[in-house]
């Protein structure tokens, strides 16, 4: 969640300062956001056939890989063009749409008898973890998308490691 909050915090600067989007910011932002709705609809169709764990793992792996690739691009090739950024934005938001609902449901699965309390605790803990990560990623914003995509790649890799650990536990 931390890099996603950092994206929300820096998106206006990215679109207006880096890509000179001007008044089109809201439209470009919305274009990327539509993919979260598409992910929810697709998830509803696939979850019974493939399961929450598998869909979450595939989405997290995809999010991590596309972010690592774009991070590498920014470091070795230079600033990506607007179209490439939009493809990444739409893709990572789609992945987030697949991940959040499934992971929250998986976390709540064994706690059905105290679901309300568990939801409140999970919400508080995820906020307490996300905000410092968001602050860290946002703090490195330097009129480049590199810190943001690096944050997604690193947090994604850490999340994949935690998913593997949780599966074995």
Spans of features found by a protein language model:
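C-terminal transmembrane helical hairpin of 12-TM major facilitator-type secondary transporters
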Residues: 54-103
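Helix-to-loop junctions at the C-terminal end of transmembrane segments
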Residues: 39-54
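Extracytoplasmic gate region of multi-pass secondary transporters
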Residues: 1-29, 35
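A late C-terminal transmembrane helix in Major Facilitator Superfamily
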Residues: 104-142, 151-152
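Juxtamembrane helix-start elements in MFS-like secondary transporters
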Residues: 21-29, 81, 85, 144
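Residue-level signature of mid-helix packing/kink "hotspots" within the transmembrane helices
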Residues: 33-41, 131
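Multi-pass alpha-helical transporter architecture, strongest
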Residues: 153-169
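Transmembrane alpha-helical cores of Major Facilitator Superfamily
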Residues: 30, 34, 90, 120-128
